[in-house]
Amino acid sequence: MFKIVNRYGKSVTVVMRMEEKTLFTSEVLANIVCKFLNTKKTKPDWLVNNFDVVACKPYMVEKV
């Protein structure tokens, strides 16, 4: 299992298939989401967390 964390160690929660997800079974999917968040300038609609996307960069994938 993998999770995405911001620079402060907080987990990122996203909405996928109408479900909120914090843990990913695939490292590839977690890396894709992480790369997207690192290049994004504004908060995407599918991001559940209420923190500043730009100020919390870089996002990293951690193994749980």
Report the location of each language-model feature.
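Short aromatic-glycine-(Arg/Gly/Cys) micro-motifs in beta-strand/loop hairpins
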Residues: 1-20, 48-53, 61
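Short, flexible N-terminal segments of the mature chain
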Residues: 11-36
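Short, mixed-charge low-complexity intrinsically disordered segments
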Residues: 31-64
